[in-house]
C-alpha cells in the first residue's frame, strides 16, 4: 500500500505463471481494477489472455501495462497491434513510448510531443472517440465542436473503464521509471 496525491493505493502482486494460478485468481475478488502486466520482450503469453478474460467476467476495470519498453529488440508497435487483435479495439494507449523508449508521451490528458511510433494526436483522437461513445450528449457536443475538455471527459472516462468500453494500455519501464509517473496519474 502507498499514498499518491492523497489517494491510498493497494497493490496485490500475483504470480503470472500457470503453476501459481491458484494464488492469483482469489486476488480478483479483492480488487476494483486488474492491471495485467505484459513483458515487452515476451509479448502476449498464454496466461495474459486468461487473466484479461477472468477480469472481464468479474466486471473489473482492466488496465494493460506494457513493461520493459526500453529492452533491446522489442517491437512495441507490433505488440500493441497484437494486444488490440487479442483483446479488442477498446485497448487503446494512454501513452506512447518516445525518445527511443526513454520516456513516454501522454495521449489523453495533455497530448503533446512525438512518439517512437504512431501519432500522439491520432492516439488522442481515438481515445476521445472511444470515451465520448459512452455519453450521447457529450458525443453530440464533440461532433459539433470537434473537441471536448478534460473536465467533460472525466466522468465518461470512468464510466468507459467500468463498463469495459475502454481498456487503457500504458507503456512503462520499471528499470528507468519511464511511464511510471504517468501511470500513477
Regions from the language model: what does each represent?
Residues 1-33, 47, 53-56, 60:
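Switch I (G2) and immediately adjacent beta-strands of P-loop GTPase domains
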Amino acid at each position: 500500500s502507498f499514498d499518491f496525491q492523497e489517494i491510498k493505493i493497494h497493490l496485490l502482486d500475483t504470480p503470472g505463471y500457470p503453476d501459481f494460478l491458484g494464488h492469483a485468481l482469489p486476488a480478483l475478488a479483492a480488487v476494483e481494477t486488474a492491471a495485467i502486466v505484459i513483458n515487452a520482450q515476451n509479448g502476449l503469453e498464454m496466461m495474459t489472455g486468461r487473466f484479461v478474460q477472468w477480469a472481464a467476467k468479474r466486471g473489473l476495470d482492466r488496465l494493460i501495462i506494457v513493461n520493459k519498453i526500453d529492452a533491446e529488440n522489442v517491437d512495441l508497435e507490433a505488440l500493441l497491434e497484437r494486444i488490440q487483435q487479442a483483446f479488442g479495439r477498446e485497448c487503446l494507449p494512454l501513452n506512447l513510448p518516445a525518445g527511443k523508449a526513454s520516456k513516454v508521451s501522454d495521449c489523453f490528458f495533455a497530448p503533446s510531443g512525438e512518439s517512437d511510433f504512431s501519432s500522439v494526436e491520432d492516439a488522442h483522437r481515438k481515445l476521445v472517440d472511444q470515451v465520448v461513445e459512452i455519453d450521447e450528449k457529450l458525443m453530440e457536443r464533440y461532433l459539433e465542436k470537434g473537441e471536448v475538455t478534460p473536465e467533460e471527459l472525466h466522468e465518461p472516462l470512468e464510466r468507459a473503464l467500468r463498463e469495459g468500453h475502454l481498456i487503457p494500455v500504458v507503456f512503462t519501464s520499471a528499470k528507468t521509471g519511464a511511464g511510471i509517473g504517468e501511470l500513477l496519474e
